Swiss-Prot record:
Pfam family, one: Ribosomal_L21p
One GO CC term, this protein: cytoplasm
Source organism: Novosphingobium aromaticivorans (strain ATCC 700278 / DSM 12444 / CCUG 56034 / CIP 105152 / NBRC 16084 / F199)
UniProt keyword terms in alphabetical order: Ribonucleoprotein, Ribosomal protein, RNA-binding, rRNA-binding
Protein's name in the database: Large ribosomal subunit protein bL21
Disulfide linkage: none
Keyword NADP tagged: no
GO MF annotation: an example: rRNA binding
Length: 98
């Protein structure tokens, strides 16, 4: 069975056993959480009532994503700025979709 869940402003298609990286969620590695907002659920071609479906996940780790470099430059004015940013994220293992 699969489900479409929304967390951190993004939507993910998940099934039992999947690993996903989402925006940072509160909790430590090993904690069990429930992903609240299930938008769609089904199996194969048939769809189930999403209101009755719960998605359980386990936090694998709290990590940071790849670094994004922001570089600003104004030509002929000797103006250069270089900034880096690493977004915090949570790695999840989907335990069950029921």
């Amino acid at each position: 069975m699969f489900a479409i869940v929304r967390t951190g402003g993004k939507q993910y298609r998940v099934a039992a056993g999947d690993k996903i990286a989402v925006e940072k969620l509160a909790g430590e590695a090993g904690d069990k959480i429930t992903l609240g907002e299930v938008l769609l659920a089904g199996e194969g071609d048939s769809l189930a009532d999403a209101a009755k479906v719960t998605v359980s996940a386990e936090i694998i780790a709290q990590a940071k994503s790849e670094k994004v470099i922001v570089f600003k430059k104004r030509r002929r004015h000797n103006y250069r700025r270089r900034n880096g940013h690493r977004q915090q994220m949570t790695l999840l293992r989907i335990v069950s979709v029921a």
